[in-house]
Amino acid sequence: MATQRRANPSSLHLITVFSLLVAVVSAEVFFEESFNDGWESRWVKSEWKKDENMAGEWNHTSGKWNGDANDKGIQTSEDYRFYAISAEFPEFSNKGKNLVFQFSVKHEQKLDCGGGYMKLLSGDVDQKKFGGDTPYSIMFGPDICGYSTKKVHAILTYNDTNHLIKKEVPCETDQLTHVYTFILRPDATYSILIDNVEKQSGSLYSDWDLLPPKTIKDPSAKKPEDWDEKEFIDDPEDKKPEGYDDIPEEITDPDAKKPEDWDDEEDGEWTAPTIPNPEYKGPWKPKKIKNPNYKGKWKAPLIDNPDFKDDPDLYVFPKLKYVGVELWQVKSGTLFDNIVICDDPEYAKAIAEETWGKQKDAEKAAFEEAEKKREEEESKAAPADSDAEEDDDADDDSDDADDKSESKDDEAHDEL
C-alpha cells in the first residue's frame, strides 16, 4: 500500500525536516496513515456487533482542541459501544529487520474506562467480521479502566497464545495527544516509547513468557543435613544473673496508703495494692549473636531446562498484513492518528516530531482555553442551578405538607 500523506504545502505532514529526509532514504515503510482525504477507501468498518446495535460510529475530525485543524484522525463518537475498523497493506515479514509500530492517540473525553490500543494482524482476515475474537499478532497501546488499570498493553501472540508483557508500563491519562511507539529488534530486544521517550525496554526472553525458562531448579536436589539456615543463635557466653528468677513480676505499691475510713472489722484487713515491678524483665533469654556457621537460605541449584528449546525467530511475525482498532468504550472521544509501520525507529521518531512535536504546544493552549470557557460557563450556570434547587426544595416542602395533609385525612377517615 502506498504511503498516504497530505499534498497540501502548508500541512505539518509535509516531509520538510532534514532528519526526516535522511530517515526516508533508509527506511522501509510498510504502512503509513494520516487520515487525509480518501481515508475511508483505505479502511474497512467492521459489522461486528452491528446486529446487536452495539457497533459505534467513527468521526473524521481533528477534535475539540488541536494544534492543527487540518490534521484529522478518526474518533469514537458513541458511548457504551464496540469499535472495530481495519486497513490492509502488502504482506511482509519482519525477519532480519526492525519492526516499528507507532500511532498517536488522544482521549478527549477524560477516559475512565476504555482502550486506546491498536492491533497488527497476520494472514487473511475478513475485515467485515473483524472483532474481539479475531486472532492478532500484536496488540499495543494504552488501556484505562478505573483506578487499577492505567497501563500500556504490549501483547504478543506466539504459538496461537496471547502473551502479556510482565513489566508494568504506565500510560498517559490526560486529554492531550500522545504518541506510542513499539520497537521490536532482530536480537529479540524491544523498546516502548511514549512521546519519543523510552519508558520500558528489555528482552522477549525475560519480559514475556513466550518460551519455557532456560533454567529450572533441580528437582532432585536436597538440602544438606548440616546446612545451617539460622542467621542468629543464642550467645553461649551469656549467663543468667544470680537471683534473676527470684525477681517478682509485681510488688507492693510503696506509695499506697490505707484509707482513713478503712475499718478492719467491717472491711477486713487492708492490703496494699500491687504494681508492675520495674525490675522484672520477664523470662530470661540469652542474647543473640551472629551464627558463624550461617550459610543463608538454601536454594536448589539451577539446571538446564529439558523442556526449553530456543527459537532464533522468536521476534518474527512472518505474515503481517493488517492494522486495526478493536475496542470497547464506556465513554467515547478517543482519537487515533498518524499510524506508522516501518523498520526504522528514526523515521518513526521524525514523523512524531513533525506531527505531534510541532502541534503539542498549540494543542495544550487550545485545551486550556477550552477548559477555561467550560469553567466559566459552569460558574455562570451555578446561581441558576442554586435557584432551581431552592425551587425544588420549596416544591418538596409543599409536597411534604400535602403528604401530611393526606395522612391526616387518612387518619380521620380511619377514625370514622
Swiss-Prot record:
Sequence ranges of Acidic residues compositional bias = 226-236, 244-253, 386-403
Map the sequence repeats onto residue numbers.
199-210, 218-229, 235-246, 253-264, 268-278, 282-292, 296-306
Show the disulfide pairing.
Answer: 113-145
Record keywords, A-Z: Calcium, Chaperone, Disulfide bond, Endoplasmic reticulum, Glycoprotein, Lectin, Metal-binding, Repeat, Signal, Zinc
Q: Where is this region: Disordered?
A: 215-286, 355-416
Q: Name one GO cellular component term.
A: endoplasmic reticulum lumen
SUPFAM superfamilies linked to this entry: Concanavalin A-like lectins/glucanases (SSF49899), P-domain of calnexin/calreticulin (SSF63887)
- Glycosylation: residue positions: 59, 159
In the UniProt record, the signal sequence range is: 1-27
Entry protein name: Calreticulin
Q: Which organism is it from?
A: Nicotiana plumbaginifolia
